[in-house]
Swiss-Prot record:
Species: Ralstonia pickettii (strain 12J)
Domain named Core-binding (CB): residues: 13-100
GO biological process: cell division; chromosome segregation; DNA transposition
Family note: Belongs to the 'phage' integrase family. XerC subfamily.
Signal peptide coordinates: none
Name of the protein described by the UniProt record: Tyrosine recombinase XerC
Amino acid sequence: MPQSASVDDHGAQAPHPQIAAYLDALKFERQLSPHTLQSYTRELAVLQRLGAQHAANIDLTQLQSHHIRRMMAQLHGDGLSGRSIARALSAWRGWFKWMALRDAAVTANPVDGVRAPKSPKRLPKALSVEQAVALMEQLPGDDAETIRDRAVNELFYSCGLRLSELVSLDMRHVKAGAYESASWLDLEAREVQVLGKGSKRRTVPVGTKATEALAAWLAVRAQLAKSDAAPEDAHALFLSPRGKRLAQRQIQLRMKRNAIAAGVPADVHPHVLRHSFATHMLQSSGDLRAVQELLGHASIASTQVYTSLDFQHLAKIYDQAHPRAKKK
């Protein structure tokens, strides 16, 4: 017999008794945050609503995989993204797993083996070459912070570093007492040694413009340095006005502001410069494997997304140049 579900004063269906019990367990036993708990509540309400539509004659705990697949198909048909459906399936799977430990009648998890449809990969945003040059060259001011910001921008664009990798850089390799640099700049060799994701180390060359910008920054770095700084800050390549290692959030905020000052009409953040580096390198060289190594991707599949961007560039050139492709 299916358990009846009442309707609350606002016309919404009250939670299935076992869903209500599960939500209480998440709240009081697992102590999930209110935001996460709200997400579970929403996804399980969808399960209950769709269960009533697709299997009204059985209790929610007795749903089978074919019910779940039909419900997923409805969500997909309603326009939900693969990511949103995957989030719903995850919440449903958790509830059925919890139920299986408490109810002998629940002998299998109907969500196991059900996979959400894949969402199309979102292509990363990249600046045009002209926009990248403007961001590098049209930043007004000659104070220490502005000189530092120019060096930050140039290094991002020259090396394609992740934000976490850039802030971890020291001025040089240091091993003093308990402190040892994880990542560092070797200005003389014109390269950076980076400890990236998965503790994978790589060497990335630094271009001429970035080398010049870094030299200019190192010449004024002492203006922001503090004599009593801890080793973590004393050896940092980039400093805040308080003499601390420059924080990721500070870089993000200043880059956004500096982009506006440089007249770059784009939502610029550090990862946009990493994407721009990869896209422009691939357009110039066509060497996907080299770009993979420079970016520090463990798999070539992560780098292949840039081939789509490169094809867009080639298609645009084709449309502009081919006599039979030009729009009249």
